[in-house]
Design a protein with these regions (language model features):
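Long C-terminal interaction/binding lobes of large macromolecular proteins
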Residues: 187, 206-208, 216-236, 246-250, ...
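Extended, highly charged accessory segments
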Residues: 283-352, 366-367, 410-411, 418-704
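Short, acidic/hydrophobic/Gly-rich beta-strand patch recurrent on exposed beta strands
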Residues: 354-357, 400
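Short, solvent-exposed secondary-structure boundary/capping segments
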Residues: 393-410
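Short, well-ordered loop/turn sites that connect or cap secondary structure elements
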Residues: 347-349, 374, 381
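Short beta-strand-centered aromatic/proline hotspots
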Residues: 385-392
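Helicase motor core with emphasis on the C-terminal RecA-like subdomain
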Residues: 2-274, 279-329
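A conserved acidic, glycine/proline-rich C-terminal tail/linker
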Residues: 360-379
Length: 704
């Protein structure tokens, strides 16, 4: 709306802007776009008031400043509710806990317990963490209770909007006893009829757990009820960490993005569409936002030059989007106007193909990368229905209903959510309590068998310790390092270690990671001691080495694809004539290579590299982890068999090489072998501990 000249009259008498769920925008480019839009509105209507609402944010002062901006003339207040919303959290503990857990079966072993909980309430939301899991859980529940057909539904972001709207209204009307969903129902709709929420698998963050719990009992004076169903044993620790954080009001902070130039390039064109402006007018308005409060003059000049000349792309007319006429910036080309208005926004995703019945309505969307692998006759799940692919034509996957078992399950990007830093600290504290044999809540008492075995065969690290395990067998040499900092940090640590080792020793090293640690695996001996690990995990030349270790050029190229879309350098096409992902990738690569060759100092290239470090690799958390490790005592244990800590990493290593069914069969076989080894341990647990200390402690190193 702000790109049209009529907006000046439309918003002139606006009095109030209310931004709901501000925490969901803060720290994302959608939030940056909101800040810029609010700055534009404040220019049009100087007396407008801004309100922000949030129930789950840790850094409330920062949220305030980013919302009201830098030029607020009136005082700004934070209003806190004095009503304490109670959250009743119930943990469903498995009847038998695997002492060798793995994160591959998405908790379906708890299906009976989930169905029993659904039966105990009038209306339930069953949250999973990914769209893929939502499809599988919906089918599993329906197979177990076919009489619930028509009474349960599915909801996620890749379903057709009309289907999602129908499900939301059916919840409000009390027509459904359960809905299996993802974060698509975290926000936006109030469901007073919902009695309880079931969370399958760890939410990976305290704020997300509170947000989802709040979907139940959504009326004044009512408490929220959340039932937590762990997908594997270690997630019980994550729940206790989250429960403790909630009781202590420790909610994750949202890290703000500082002055992204792709958003500013887009905004410069949007402003020029509505009304010609001078440079100083543009600079003052942009600097009134919190994100761009320190925008340098040279960066502003670069943005305005880029939208007028295209920089090194000046030979191409499409990049001359804004004209400078008598000191004013304006858009005079109608083709530019149409193309830009269709591209406004900061939400980017993989190219989606619509899924539609041959004779009937639309079902939803799958990513092009998944659709490209489908063959005629392939069966897949979407929207809780089993579909058979007939053909793909003109950007649409045409299907018919079918029966049997799926031969493919759609997978969408963004499936792995890393453990938040606050929750990771809580996990380490509980593991420390277990190591010190302190009194534990009942939920963690259920893990005693698993943890006793970890202590017997290896070690349980305390807060000031770093555990390293090593296992050599006929398949190769495996080294496990446990940081308990989340998947993103584990990926960074693993890549850094493998890169630095490979510079000094010739060896083929593969990496496996999870939220708790990493595994380096080599067919030949890795030959690493604690002193070498401490050396390789120093912060010396950290940024250069981490970029080199992860093929920084390719990572930057992928990140640049999103930046180029937001900045308007590539276009997804027009309605009915969308471009394929292959075409967009080729276009992005051409622009990227041209800038690298002819304009290596281009600020959008710099932004892409910076986002790879800060967002994808979370280098700030990586630095904090390395600092903590430098100050810790290192414990090195040579293993005779896989431990409860190392077993999930072993599963991650072989997962990509084996199909799901074959993987489950192989994992169960290895679990049985390890359980037999446990049962044959000679003597009592006390005697075994003495033997372990006598043998294992001889192979333990500490910091030199």
């Amino acid at each position: 709306m702000l790109s049209y000249p009529e907006s000046l009259e439309t918003f002139k008498h606006l009095r109030t802007v209310i931004v709901d769920e501000w925490h969901e925008l803060l720290g994302s480019k959608r939030g940056i776009q909101t800040e810029l839009a609010l700055a534009r509105i404040s220019r049009i209507a100087p007396t407008v008031r801004r309100w922000g609402l949030s129930a789950t944010i840790g850094n409330i002062d920062h949220a305030k400043y980013s919302l009201v901006g830098q030029s607020a003339s009136a005082p700004c207040s934070i209003i806190r509710s004095d009503q304490q919303r109670l959250i009743d959290i119930e943990l469903v503990i498995p009847q038998a806990i695997d002492r060798f857990p793995w994160a591959g079966h998405i908790g379906l072993v708890m299906l009976k317990e989930v169905i029993a909980k659904i039966e105990s309430a009038n209306s339930t939301l069953v949250f999973t963490n990914t769209r893929n899991q939502t499809e599988l859980w919906y089918q599993a529940i329906l197979r177990a209770r076919p009489d619930w057909a028509g009474q349960i539904a599915i909801h996620h972001g890749s379903l057709a909007p009309e289907l999602r709207t129908w499900v939301e209204q059916a919840i409000v009307d009390g027509k459904l006893i359960a809905v299996v969903c993802t974060s698509s129902l975290d926000l936006g709709v109030d469901f007073a009829p919902v009695d309880q929420v079931i969370q399958v698998g760890s939410p990976k963050g305290t704020a997300r757990l509170i947000q989802r719990a709040g979907r139940s009992g959504h009326s004044p004076g009512r408490s929220s009820k959340l039932v937590f169903v762990p997908a594997h044993a270690f997630e019980i620790i994550e729940l206790e960490a989250a429960r403790q954080a909630i009781s202590q009001k420790q909610i994750e902070q949202r890290r703000a993005i500082d002055a992204p130039l792709d958003c500013l390039v887009q905004h410069a064109v949007t402003m020029a569409l509505a009304k010609p402006y001078a440079k100083q007018e543009f600079l003052e308005e942009v600097r009134s936002t919190y994100a761009y409060r320190n925008l340098a003059d040279e960066h502003c000049d670069w943005v305005l030059d880029f939208v007028t000349t295209g920089g090194c792309l000046h030979a191409y007319k499409d990049f001359h989007r804004v004209a400078l006429d008598f000191g004013k910036y304006a858009v005079i080309d109608q083709a530019v106007s149409r193309r830009h208005r269709m591209s406004i926004g900061t939400i980017t995703s993989d190219m989606m193909l619509q899924v539609q019945y041959l004779k009937g309505g639309k079902i939803g969307f799958v990513e092009e990368s998944f659709a490209a692998k489908l063959k005629e006759g392939d069966k897949f799940l979407l929207g809780g229905k089993l579909l058979e692919m007939v053909w793909i034509r003109e950007g649409t996957v045409w299907v018919r209903k079918t029966k049997g078992d799926p031969t493919a399950v759609p997978r969408w990007l963004g499936g792995n959510m890393p453990l938040s830093s606050e929750l990771a600290l809580g996990v380490r504290r509980w593991i420390d309590a277990i190591a010190r044999k302190e009194p534990l809540p009942d939920s963690l008492q259920a893990l005693c068998g698993l943890m006793d075995l970890q202590r017997l065969w290896s070690h349980i690290p305390r807060l000031d310790e770093v555990l390293v395990e090593r296992l050599t067998n006929r398949e190769g040499d495996a080294l496990m390092l446990y940081g308990f900092e989340g998947r993103s940090v584990s990926e960074g640590l693993g890549a850094l270690l493998a890169y630095r080792i490979s510079k000094e020793r010739k060896n083929t090293i593969s990496i496996a990671v999870n939220d708790y640690g990493l595994m380096l695996y080599a067919p030949d001996s890795i030959g690493i001691d604690t002193k070498s690990l401490v050396h390789w995990l120093s912060q010396r030349e950290l940024q250069a080495d981490i970029l080199s270790s992860l093929n920084a050029t390719e990572l930057t190229r992928r990140r640049f694809r999103d930046i180029a879309r937001i900045a308007g350098l590539i276009h997804s096409g027009t309605p009915g004539q969308s471009k394929s992902m292959r075409h967009l990738q080729a276009s992005t690569s051409m622009v990227f290579d041209a800038l690298k060759q002819y304009d290596p100092a281009n600020l959008l290239l710099w932004q892409a590299s910076d986002e790879v470090l800060s967002d994808q690799l979370q280098i700030h958390r990586l630095k904090e982890t390395l600092t903590r490790m430098e100050e810790s005592r290192w414990v090195h244990v040579d293993l005779k068999q896989w431990t409860p800590f190392s077993f999930p990493l072993m599963v991650e290593r072989i997962r990509d090489r084996i199909g799901n069914e074959s993987l489950a069969q192989r994992i169960r076989k290895i679990q049985n072998q390890l359980e037999q080894g446990t049962a044959s341990e000679s003597g009592s647990l006390t005697k075994s501990k003495r033997n372990a200390e006598k043998g294992n402690m001889q192979s333990r190193d500490t910091n030199p």
